[in-house]
């Protein structure tokens, strides 16, 4: 037999073979995946993150310790990252070598096969032995996804051409699951066609696009740091970035004087416009505008930010009272008209109200973000246990690989949600500091 590659000349396919009367692991013969992957340029980096070659062996048999024949059907999964496939004839010869060999139980046979196949494939291989009775209630189901076999298209060439794949690349981000029953590949050994069903889920572009966005955001943040530190592009930014889950929140302290919001630029500007209306600002400061802050500008029931946020609310805004700024109280010291003064006073009150509402809203968002993070952490803990549950069931041969992979994917999604929630906590905490014009102990 003429082979396409010299590495295949040692295979027993096409040769006369003797029946193996006892279990023999040396019958297995590998076929390197690189024979096909090198031509596609995907030997080192595959364009997918999960996958397996799945074999179903319908004629598994061995003897128990009393010499009684046992039968089973095996599901065998060769991980896509394994170095080798296993040549089909050698695979069948190997499985048949179990027929006249004694094993203690199902588990012993399963572990033996899994060990031998993993060594031959040089990768992860899972074996699940099922009693024949398991298939009594098994239904034939349709694969999830959109079948593309009924497209009204014309095909004129059946030769492999990798350039066609390049034309499929688009900037459009898509997420889809496609199914086809028309997968045909010619065997490297016999050049005969093998038919199969293929299910492909294309979501990798979305993941790559998100990664690019995150890298761009990080570069923008790095630029800001370089500007602040006056560093040139070729100078090292000697900063160690901690993992976001290790970043501790400083905490928000609302038990501080309301006067702290006087440091806000908008409040300070309104305060300046109002104070400029007086003939003698220094005299008025001692009477009703002490130390040029907002502490005396609020009602006596709102001496701290925390209590100010609990004042009666009307139409969704915090109500404040500034009786000492009434016209009758200060008209002797005002150098502008009553109308202009009232405009400045109202603007001043509105700025204070806006500032307090801003603090209130941001603090509420902060507490909500903390609750969300706590809930997601509990959810992730449950998902970890669910993944372990399905992994144990799969290793025990009572659950499908697909169920384990779905659970693992859900666990990873919840882990990403936790990272995003922690980021939201930090952002909302900083928003509170910003609305209070600083962090206060």
Swiss-Prot record:
GO biological process, one term: transmembrane transport
Molecular function per GO: efflux transmembrane transporter activity; transmembrane transporter activity
Superkingdom: Bacteria
The protein's name: Uncharacterized protein HI_1340
Cellular component per GO, a single term: membrane
Source organism (scientific name): Haemophilus influenzae (strain ATCC 51907 / DSM 11121 / KW20 / Rd)
Similarity annotation: Belongs to the outer membrane factor (OMF) (TC 1.B.17) family.
Cysteine pairs bridged by disulfides in the record: none
């Amino acid at each position: 037999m003429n082979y396409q590659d010299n590495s295949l000349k040692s295979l027993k396919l096409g040769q006369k073979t003797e029946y193996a009367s006892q279990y023999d692991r040396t019958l297995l013969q590998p076929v390197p995946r690189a024979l096909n992957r090198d031509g596609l340029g995907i030997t080192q980096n595959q364009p997918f993150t999960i996958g397996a070659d799945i074999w179903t062996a319908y004629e598994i048999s061995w003897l128990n310790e009393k010499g009684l024949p046992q039968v089973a059907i095996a599901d065998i999964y060769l991980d896509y990252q394994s170095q080798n496939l296993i040549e089909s004839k050698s695979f069948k010869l190997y499985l048949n070598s179990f027929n006249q060999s004694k094993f203690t139980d199902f588990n012993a046979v399963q572990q033996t096969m899994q060990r031998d196949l993993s060594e031959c494939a040089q990768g992860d291989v899972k074996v699940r032995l099922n009693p024949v009775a398991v298939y009594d209630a098994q239904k034939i189901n349709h694969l999830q996804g959109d079948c593309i076999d009924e497209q009204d298209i014309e095909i004129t060439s059946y030769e492999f051409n990798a350039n066609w794949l390049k034309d499929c690349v688009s900037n459009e981000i898509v997420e889809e699951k496609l199914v086809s029953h028309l997968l045909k590949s010619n065997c490297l050994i016999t050049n005969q066609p093998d038919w199969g069903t293929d299910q492909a889920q294309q979501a990798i572009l979305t993941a790559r696009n998100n990664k690019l966005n995150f890298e761009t955001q990080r570069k923008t943040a790095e630029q800001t740091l370089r500007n602040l530190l006056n560093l040139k592009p070729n100078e090292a930014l000697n900063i160690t970035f901690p993992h976001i889950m290790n970043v501790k929140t400083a905490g928000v302290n609302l038990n501080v004087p309301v006067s702290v919001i006087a440091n806000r630029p908008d409040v300070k500007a309104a305060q300046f416009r109002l104070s400029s209306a007086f003939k003698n600002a220094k005299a008025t400061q001692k009477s009703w505008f002490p130390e040029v802050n907002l502490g005396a500008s609020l009602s006596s029931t709102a001496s701290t930010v925390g209590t100010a946020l609990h004042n009666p609310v009307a139409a969704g805004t915090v109500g404040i009272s500034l009786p000492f700024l009434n016209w009758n109280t200060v008209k002797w010291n005002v150098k502008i008209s009553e109308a202009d003064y009232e405009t400045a006073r109202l603007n001043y009150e509105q700025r204070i109200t806006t500032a307090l509402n801003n603090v209130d809203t941001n603090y509420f968002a902060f507490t909500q973000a903390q609750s969300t993070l706590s809930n997601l952490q509990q959810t992730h803990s449950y998902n970890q246990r669910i993944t372990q549950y399905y992994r144990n069931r799969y290793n025990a041969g009572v659950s499908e690989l697909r169920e384990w992979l779905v659970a693992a994917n859900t666990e990873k999604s919840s882990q990403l949600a936790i990272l995003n929630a922690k980021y939201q906590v930090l952002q909302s905490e900083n928003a509170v500091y910003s609305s209070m014009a600083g962090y206060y102990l």
